[in-house]
Amino acid sequence: MPGIVVHQGEDFESAYRKFKRQVDRNLIVVELRKRRFYEPPSERRKKEKIATRKKILRKLWMLRRYESRL
């Protein structure tokens, strides 16, 4: 959980920027968006399968593109 120490005389804007930077580094907002709605395990597996297929096709495309330049 991100937390910052606000020093005496430090303005709100700089403290807010520090806090926002920590939140961004910890990927809290991304995690919240991902968990906003419940995703059944079957949907999760389906998405992983699609992502894997895209990754393989992308690598194959890059390989063919590289070989055509030789």
Curated annotation (Swiss-Prot):
GO terms for cellular component: ribonucleoprotein complex; ribosome. GO terms for molecular function: structural constituent of ribosome. Signal peptide: none annotated. Keywords: Ribonucleoprotein, Ribosomal protein. GO terms for biological process: translation. It comes from the Bacteria. The keyword Ribonucleoprotein applies. HAMAP family: Ribosomal_bS21 (MF_00358). Belongs to the bacterial ribosomal protein bS21 family. This is Small ribosomal subunit protein bS21. The lineage of its organism: Bacteria, Pseudomonadati, Campylobacterota, Epsilonproteobacteria, Nautiliales. The gene is rpsU.
